[in-house]
Amino acid sequence: MLEKIFPKIHSEGYKFLAIAIIVTIFLYVLSTFLGLIGLVLSIWVYYFFRDPERISINDENYLTSPADGEVLMVHEVDGPKELGLEDRKFTKISIFMNVFDCHVNRTPCEGKISEILYKPGKFLNASLDKASEDNERNYYKITNTHGEEIIVVQIAGLIARRIVCESSKDQQLQQGERIGMIRFGSRADVYFENYESLVKVGQKTIAGETLLAKK
């Protein structure tokens, strides 16, 4: 119960929370009002870097959301050319994470990471379609238990300035397992074949729990 009210924070947040607390103490010495502003800032930093436990369905016939946020797009596209998949058609679901969403990303399926590819880029608004090709991003190619390739892409946004990858090539993953995070506003794209989408544009998602697609 306590974990639900006060979830642990991601290790990426330790430094930011420490800085926020120090600033809060300094501001409180100057003024109670300023100290309260600092306290609100500290609470927001804690909230942003929260890393709650999630319970996945653990079913190979479903894909779960890789991110908390809102579904921006659901459409058929060519596969990412960066991974040599441009000659194949995939369903692509894009999920936008605003600064109030949990930014820890998770794998949508059980499987093995066959490739991780980082691409430097711009920091355009992550809600724009061209962010998929222009922004800083990190690709994960995951081979699921059916032998199919599921692609997850972390995309940095207008405010985000660091993509954190916590996984490695050939790592075996369980559905809903953490693979990384993005700091301060961003987006996650999922590419898949042979699954039927279960979500619609505007729908809210929870990483590791919301069902994105089914066989």
UniProtKB/Swiss-Prot annotation:
Recorded coiled-coil stretches: none
Q: How does it sit in the membrane?
A: Peripheral membrane protein
Q: Which sites are catalytic?
A: 186 (schiff-base intermediate with substrate)
**An example molecular function term from Gene Ontology annotations:** phosphatidylserine decarboxylase activity
Q: What keywords are annotated for this sequence in UniProt? A: Cell membrane, Decarboxylase, Lipid biosynthesis, Lipid metabolism, Lyase, Membrane, Phospholipid biosynthesis, Phospholipid metabolism, Pyruvate, Zymogen
What does the record give as the reaction this protein catalyses?
Answer: a 1,2-diacyl-sn-glycero-3-phospho-L-serine + H(+) = a 1,2-diacyl-sn-glycero-3-phosphoethanolamine + CO2
| PTM per Swiss-Prot/TrEMBL | Is synthesized initially as an inactive proenzyme. Formation of the active enzyme involves a self-maturation process in which the active site pyruvoyl group is generated from an internal serine residue via an autocatalytic post-translational modification. Two non-identical subunits are generated from the proenzyme in this reaction, and the pyruvate is formed at the N-terminus of the alpha chain, which is derived from the carboxyl end of the proenzyme.
Residues with Pyruvic acid (Ser) modification: 186
Describe which pathway this protein belongs to, using the record's wording: Phospholipid metabolism; phosphatidylethanolamine biosynthesis; phosphatidylethanolamine from CDP-diacylglycerol: step 2/2
GO cellular component terms, A-Z: plasma membrane
Cofactor: binding comment: Binds 1 pyruvoyl group covalently per subunit.
* Localization (cell): Cell membrane
Co-factor requirement: pyruvate
> At which residues is there a site annotated Cleavage (non-hydrolytic)?
185-186
BP-aspect Gene Ontology terms: phosphatidylethanolamine biosynthetic process
Q: What is its EC number?
A: 4.1.1.65
One Pfam family name from the record? PS_Dcarbxylase
Q: Which NCBIfam families match?
A: PRK05305.1-2 (NF003678), PRK05305.1-3 (NF003679), PRK05305.2-5 (NF003685)
- Family to which this protein belongs: Belongs to the phosphatidylserine decarboxylase family. PSD-A subfamily.
Biological function: Catalyzes the formation of phosphatidylethanolamine (PtdEtn) from phosphatidylserine (PtdSer).
Subunit info?
Answer: Heterodimer of a large membrane-associated beta subunit and a small pyruvoyl-containing alpha subunit.
Q: What is this protein called?
A: Phosphatidylserine decarboxylase proenzyme
Please name the source species.
Answer: Pelagibacter ubique (strain HTCC1062)
